[in-house]
């Protein structure tokens, strides 16, 4: 069902929220009459931070205007005449509004569509059995909204009380002036004759006594009104503090935690729009109460009456200033975090946002935000309010940006699009700590003027910790530092303290989250996979996951100490698995065609009762990012065979599916699925040509084909009897595939258009030297390409 049809079925508060999304910036009539066209456009494909995408945004604006004009032209009849005029007016209005800033139109429509989807989803979840979590969230949000309504009513009540106090005081002042006038009349009685003076004096005395009695009584009433008003403001501020604590210390902190976990591959942190609407309501109510308190102070100064009110007002004024200060400083947040693995001399982006910028008119005097990089120790000093001015750990280019107010979405934000870390200054490292364990942070600071320079706040916010690298080879270990920090950081920590040890189930959760995100798969790590990983990490043979639940994993075990008998850490091995899956094997993993997390003995145990030609794919234990084929073929020499592991470089030359298609004696994918049924859709389709076919230039085309020497004769012997070795790839694919002898190499080291990297080149040289000089391990059957 189209989103707009569902949106029209919203009711109550959800319907009001949906209607509030529209206005002069984007009329709801445009959404209604162009609903199908709007929902069919790829609004999310445009990168709002990339100026080069401006062309796409302009095309969308032009398309929208054309569709509106077309819709207007098709209107007929009396009612159609009015609609024709209205739609034509909207076309002109939108063209005029967004002609110079088409990106704002994209931002506006994305904002609208996102919130419509959210409202529809919340409405649907609320009516489904699976919506218990959504129900709990809705209940919490309902409670917050009810508290806002209570605060609104209380604030309206204190406004009425303040007006009553003001009117009472104004009348009191008038009567007080009358009392002064009577006193002046007493002074003039001496000019009258005795009889008239006596008569006049008696009348004035009676009037004066009556008026003074009234003034004394009214002064007490005024004082009582003032005390009652101050007490009501105290109660309002208590409720405001409670509401602000829920929003800032609960909801906003949860959003930041989701943002942190999203850095590990968790679900997106979600929109800030609901949080911003709450913060704006807080700002509005706080500011109204602050203005009321200041007016009450002015009334007290205008007519001083001895009593406790002055002290009470001074207290509530200080309290509300603290509240608004906390609101402004806490709602200056990083909407889009900088990359947590930050390479020097590389462009990066970030976005900061003030959630109360529109309501407090901060945008009337657009503030400038500055970004600097500081060390972990400098971040600690900053939070202790120690003087760290101009104490930075590096130089960032393009690090200043003016905050912009986006009328369509009501957001005040600064988009740093072209920052680059020019240099970094490292601190002395502790013990075995490497450069990829050193944490920095990007500090964003600014100065906000609130209420027409009435209040000025210095605001600062820190990014999630970043690890600075100077070469791509450091990325693996830097990612481990970031993963550990994001997963196990505790709320309110001292920067950037993390536990040195965590329970194995906690690490399992983090690894699974990262794995699914990196491989971009819903097929995560199974219980059996986690048992295999635990065996690898702890060097224990138990097959029960429960046996590992109480065991702890230290950071050193994770990515500082090598695994027993290996020259790599647990994380380096796991990251290699993710890398090869992500780059070359993702569809096969999603199909369940890769068993992966089994060792050699487990593979043999699984294959022992299977027919010859059954094979499985498992991750190599000796080669980072390697995957090997284990298969069963009972011969005089052996029963189980293991092919030398393939790596990313191998799959860059020839895909896994094509390699498996070459090996005709591999028949069944474990447990019993025919190989071609699983892999044929991934074979490279090549037109069948005679073996002697020549290219236009007269050259004979070479072939690249996977060959295992021990099985080469059997797999190519077409005249032999029908054995398992005679199995060939699917008949729809030509078995004799032709390839260029030198296929494009994705390795940046060999890219003639790229930068020459000596270290990467030496890595390749060392690898080739190692392969040439390494004695053949009897556990592997070498593979070749012919």
Curated annotation (Swiss-Prot):
InterPro entries: p53-like_TF_DNA-bd_sf, SH2, SH2_dom_sf, STAT, STAT5_CCD, STAT5a/5b_DBD, STAT5b_SH2, STAT_linker. Changing residue 684 to A: Fails to interact with INSR. Tyrosine phosphorylated in response to signaling via activated KIT, resulting in translocation to the nucleus. Tyrosine phosphorylated in response to signaling via activated FLT3; wild-type FLT3 results in much weaker phosphorylation than constitutively activated mutant FLT3. Alternatively, can be phosphorylated by JAK2. Phosphorylation at Tyr-699 by PTK6 or HCK leads to an increase of its transcriptional activity. One of its GO terms (biological process) is positive regulation of erythrocyte differentiation. In the virgin, found in most tissues. Particularly abundant in muscle tissue of virgin and lactating females, and of males. Keywords: Activator, Cytoplasm, DNA-binding, Nucleus, Phosphoprotein, SH2 domain, Transcription, Transcription regulation. GO terms for molecular function: chromatin binding; DNA binding; DNA-binding transcription activator activity, RNA polymerase II-specific; nuclear glucocorticoid receptor binding; protein dimerization activity; protein homodimerization activity; RNA polymerase II cis-regulatory region sequence-specific DNA binding. Pfam families: SH2, STAT_alpha, STAT_bind, STAT_int, STAT_linker. The modification Phosphotyrosine is found at residues 90, 682, 699. SUPFAM superfamilies: p53-like transcription factors, SH2 domain, STAT, Transcription factor STAT-4 N-domain. Residues 589-686 form the SH2 domain. GO terms for cellular component: cytoplasm; cytosol; nucleoplasm; nucleus. It comes from the Eukaryota. Changing residue 327 to M: In strain: NOD; reduces DNA-binding affinity. PROSITE patterns: SH2 (PS50001). The modification Phosphoserine is found at residue 128. The keyword Manganese does not apply. It is found in: Cytoplasm; Nucleus. PANTHER family: SIGNAL TRANSDUCER AND ACTIVATOR OF TRANSCRIPTION. Belongs to the transcription factor STAT family. Upon activation, forms a homodimer or a heterodimer with a related family member. Binds NR3C1. Interacts with NCOA1. Interacts with SOCS7. Interacts (via SH2 domain) with INSR. Interacts with CPEB3; this inhibits STAT5B-mediated transcriptional activation. Carries out a dual function: signal transduction and activation of transcription. Mediates cellular responses to the cytokine KITLG/SCF and other growth factors. Binds to the GAS element and activates PRL-induced transcription. Positively regulates hematopoietic/erythroid differentiation. This is Signal transducer and activator of transcription 5B. The lineage of its organism: Eukaryota, Metazoa, Chordata, Craniata, Vertebrata.
């Amino acid at each position: 069902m189209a989103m707009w049809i569902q949106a029209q079925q919203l009711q109550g508060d959800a319907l009001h929220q949906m209607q509030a999304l529209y206005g002069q910036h984007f009329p709801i009539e445009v959404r209604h009459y162009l609903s199908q066209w709007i929902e069919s456009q790829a609004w999310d494909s445009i990168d709002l931070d990339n100026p080069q995408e401006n062309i796409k945004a302009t095309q969308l604006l032009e398309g929208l205007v054309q569709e509106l004009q077309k819709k207007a032209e098709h209107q007929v009849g009396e009612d159609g005449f009015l609609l024709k005029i209205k739609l034509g007016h909207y076309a002109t209005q939108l063209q005029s509004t967004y002609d110079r800033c088409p990106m704002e139109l994209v931002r506006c429509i994305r904002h609208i569509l996102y919130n419509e989807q959210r409202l529809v989803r919340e409405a649907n979840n609320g009516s489904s059995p699976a919506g218990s979590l959504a129900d709990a969230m809705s209940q919490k949000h309902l409670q917050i909204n009810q508290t806002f309504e209570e605060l609104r009513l209380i604030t309206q009540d204190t406004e009425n009380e303040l007006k009553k106090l003001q009117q009472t005081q104004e009348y009191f002042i008038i009567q007080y002036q009358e009392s002064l006038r009577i006193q002046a009349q007493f002074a003039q009685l001496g000019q009258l004759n005795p009889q008239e003076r006596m008569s006049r004096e008696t009348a004035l005395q009676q009037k004066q006594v009556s008026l003074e009695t009234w003034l004394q009584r009214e002064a007490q009433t005024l004082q009582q009104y003032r005390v009652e008003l101050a007490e009501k403001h105290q109660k309002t501020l208590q409720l405001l503090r409670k509401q602000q604590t829920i929003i800032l210390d609960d909801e906003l902190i949860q959003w930041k935690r989701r943002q942190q976990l999203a850095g590990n591959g968790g679900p997106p942190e979600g929109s800030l729009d609901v949080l911003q609407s709450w913060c704006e309501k807080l700002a509005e109510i706080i500011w109204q109460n602050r203005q009321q308190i200041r007016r009450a102070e002015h009334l007290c100064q205008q007519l001083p009456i001895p009593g406790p009110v002055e002290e009470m007002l001074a207290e509530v004024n200080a309290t509300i200033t603290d509240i608004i200060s906390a609101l402004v400083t806490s709602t200056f947040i990083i909407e889009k975090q900088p990359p947590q693995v930050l390479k020097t001399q590389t462009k990066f982006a970030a976005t900061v946002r003030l959630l109360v910028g529109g309501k407090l008119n901060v945008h009337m005097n657009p503030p400038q935000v500055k970004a600097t990089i500081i060390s972990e120790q400098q971040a600690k000093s900053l939070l202790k309010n120690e003087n760290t001015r101009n104490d930075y750990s590096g130089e960032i280019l393009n690090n200043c940006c003016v905050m912009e107010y986006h009328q369509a979405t009501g957001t005040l934000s600064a988009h740093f699009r072209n920052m680059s870390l020019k240099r970094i200054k490292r601190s002395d490292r502790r013990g075995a700590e490497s450069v990829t364990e050193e944490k920095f942070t990007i500090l964003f600071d600014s100065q906000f003027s609130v209420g027409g320079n009435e209040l000025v706040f210095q605001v600062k916010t820190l990014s999630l910790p970043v690890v600075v690298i100077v070469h791509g080879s450091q990325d693996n270990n830097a990612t481990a530092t970031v993963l550990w920090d994001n997963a196990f950081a505790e709320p309110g920590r001292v920067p950037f303290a993390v536990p040195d040890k965590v329970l194995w189930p906690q690490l399992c959760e983090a690894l699974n989250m990262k794995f699914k995100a990196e491989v971009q798969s819903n097929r995560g790590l199974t219980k059996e996979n986690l048992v295999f990983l635990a065996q690898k990490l702890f060097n224990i043979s138990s097959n029960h996951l429960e046996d590992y639940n109480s065991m702890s994993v230290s950071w050193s075990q994770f990515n500082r100490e090598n695994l027993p008998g290996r020259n790599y850490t647990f994380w380096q091995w796991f990251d290699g698995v993710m890398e090869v899956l992500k780059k070359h094997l993702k569809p096969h993993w999603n199909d369940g065609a890769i068993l992966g997390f089994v060792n050699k003995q487990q593979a043999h145990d699984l294959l022992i009762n299977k027919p010859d030609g059954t094979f499985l794919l498992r991750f190599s234990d000796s080669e980072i990012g390697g995957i090997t084929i284990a298969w069963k073929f009972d011969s005089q020499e052996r029963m189980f065979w293991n092919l030398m592991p393939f790596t990313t470089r191998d799959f860059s030359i020839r895909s896994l599916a094509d390699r498996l298609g070459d090996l005709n004696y591999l028949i069944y994918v474990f447990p019993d699925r025919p190989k071609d049924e699983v892999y044929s859709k991934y074979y490279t389709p090549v037109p069948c040509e005679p073996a002697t076919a020549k290219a236009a230039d007269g050259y004979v085309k070479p072939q690249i084909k996977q060959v295992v020497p021990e099985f080469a004769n059997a797999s190519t012997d077409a005249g032999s009897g029908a054995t398992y070795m005679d199995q060939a790839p699917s008949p729809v694919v030509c078995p004799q595939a032709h390839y260029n002898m030198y296929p494009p190499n994705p390795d940046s080291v060999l890219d003639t258009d790229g930068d020459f990297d000596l270290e990467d080149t030496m890595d390749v040289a060392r690898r080739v030297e190692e392969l040439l000089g390494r004695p053949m391990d009897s556990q592997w059957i070498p593979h070749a390409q012919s």
